[in-house]
């Protein structure tokens, strides 16, 4: 099901929910309107400049003390390095490869997030990062 189709389906099943569409880089939502934001295997789809805009938007949308939780690609350990490279070559774009070269926790700190914590998963091929908007 395409994203718009999924949104239509959700609207039919839950007519009381408000539907908001926009770009992750500049969402049409109020500042400090969320206590938590989750980004799951999405950031690697954005070029670096747009990825920074997405993260700045997340910081803007979080209320003070609010949490960002994200899961995305990380350079794999020795056993999964070749499979990860093959997967990226066959199924991903250059943006995924670029993300594997970057230090996402440091990027989050430079953007103004605090309490940044990283956990490596799946043979180091994925990372789960939590961070907060300072109070």
Regions found by a protein language model. Name each.
Residues 1-26:
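Class I SAM-dependent methyltransferase SAM/SAH-binding core
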Residues 52, 67-111, 115-128:
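C-terminal alpha-helical "lid/dimerization" subdomain adjacent to the S-adenosyl-L-methionine
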Residues 35-49:
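A short SAM/SAH-binding and catalytic strip from SAM-dependent methyltransferases
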